[in-house]
Regions:
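A charged N-terminal "starter" segment
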Residues: 1-93, 115, 149, 357-363
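Conserved, mostly hydrophobic/aromatic
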Residues: 8, 30, 64, 120, ...
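Conserved beta-strand positions in the central sheet of alpha/beta enzyme cores
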Residues: 54, 74, 95-96, 154, ...
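A structural signal for short, hydrophobic beta-strand segments that form beta-sheets
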Residues: 75, 150, 239, 295-296
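A generic, well-ordered mixed alpha/beta core segment in the N-terminal half of proteins
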Residues: 90-127
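C-terminal accessory subdomain/extension
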Residues: 246-363
Length: 363
């Protein structure tokens, strides 16, 4: 994998110009920054103007904290009992979803004689965690707490493939929260994904930017529709063998594919052990010498076969682009994932650690 950190930096800069003025930009770097490598990505984003970071759990948060202090790191998933110490040790910000969580963090803060910035999940229509009733109790408790400092509400999306990607905030709770925070003079903001419509929320806002920073185009439902990020990733392999095979020969792991004519077949040094799905036969192309070639036969752990019958020139060692651009031809991650029937995030996070990451760091 080649990862262009310069393009990552430019994507954040372009995003700031694209969006209207907001409170800030929270870089979502879950799952090892979607497989790009969280340490390298976080350092570059810190240097490029990211205001804060969002991760899935405390382990991810600790990795980001190791590479930089001074940035807020928001842990999006609810905490587990016993994890409270790690939040205080690494200055992580929990997103609280229950009164029980508040009690745990309040107790730990009292033991340590410390304070902790916290966020609270905003209740939404159709979701039950937290319910609007519990959310009101949570808000009251946090606004009264001397140890836990409520900074923000967290508005989640519902995920790709849902009937409505952007969750709708519970209007009754929003009205209650506005009344309570105004009466106390509390300055609370809302952070949200790019598929959430927050235009009616009476709070300052911050955008959680994830895949779009790493080169993925926003969905049709996104508030970033029309934004064109630069590609950050090149996923590549190389040709390891080339053979001329007769009609009727079988190809691929388990010999599941039968050639319909005399063919020239090449093997690539990549397989499901690297993150290429086992069922990629006739669903996946690669680019070699400026031409596309299609995967045929079941992918094994270490190899994949491609049909190169129409190639005039091809040699062992030739580069094969799986995701990226070569010779004026491009296979974006959206195409790669779409043809395989998976999401771009799933495709990226499936690329295993066996695949070395090489970073372009300088312009």
């Amino acid at each position: 994998m080649r990862i262009d950190l310069c393009a990552l930096e430019r994507n954040l800069g372009k995003l700031k110009y694209f969006m209207p003025k907001s409170r800030g930009y929270i870089a979502l770097v879950s799952a090892d920054a979607f497989g790009y490598g969280v340490e390298a990505a976080a350092v570059r984003l810190m240097l490029s103007g990211a205001d804060a970071f969002a991760v899935t759990n405390v382990s991810e948060g600790a990795r980001v904290r190791e590479v930089g202090s001074g940035w807020e790191i928001v842990v999006m998933s609810s905490s587990l009992p016993g994890e409270e110490d790690e939040y205080f040790e690494n200055s992580l910000t929990p997103v609280l979803v229950s009164c029980e969580e508040i009690a745990r963090f309040e107790k730990k803060a009292e033991e340590l004689g410390a304070t902790l910035a916290v966020h609270m999940r905003l209740p939404t229509v159709g979701e039950t965690v937290p319910s609007p009733e519990e959310a009101k109790k949570m808000l009251d408790a946090l606004l009264e707490s001397k140890r836990l400092k409520l900074e923000a509400f967290c508005l989640l999306g519902t995920g790709t493939g849902a009937p409505q990607e952007g969750a709708k905030p519970d209007a009754d709770f929003v009205e209650y929260a506005k009344m309570k925070t105004d009466s106390l003079g509390a300055k609370i903001f809302v952070h949200h994904s790019d598929v959430c419509d927050v235009s009616a929320l009476p709070f300052d806002r911050a955008l959680r930017a994830g895949l779009v920073l790493f080169g993925m185009k926003p969905s049709e439902n996104s508030i970033l529709k029309g934004f064109e990020p630069e590609h950050v990733l090149t996923f590549r392999s190389s040709v390891s063998q080339i053979k001329n095979l007769p009609k009727g020969a079988t190809v691929g792991y388990g010999r599941t594919y039968t050639l319909k004519k005399d063919s020239r077949v090449a093997l690539l040094s990549v397989g499901y052990g690297d993150g290429v799905p086992r069922n990629a036969s006739e669903k996946m192309d690669v680019i070699i010498r400026g031409k596309r070639a299609t995967v045929i036969g079941r992918v094994s752990m270490d190899q994949a076969a491609i049909d190169v019958s129409d190639f005039d020139e091809i040699e062992v060692g030739d580069e094969a682009i799986i995701v990226g651009e070569s010779g004026g031809i491009s296979i974006p991650i959206e195409e790669y994932a779409g043809r395989l029937g998976i999401t771009p995030a799933q495709a990226l996070t499936s690329i295993t650690k066996r695949v070395a990451r090489f970073y372009k760091m300088l312009y």
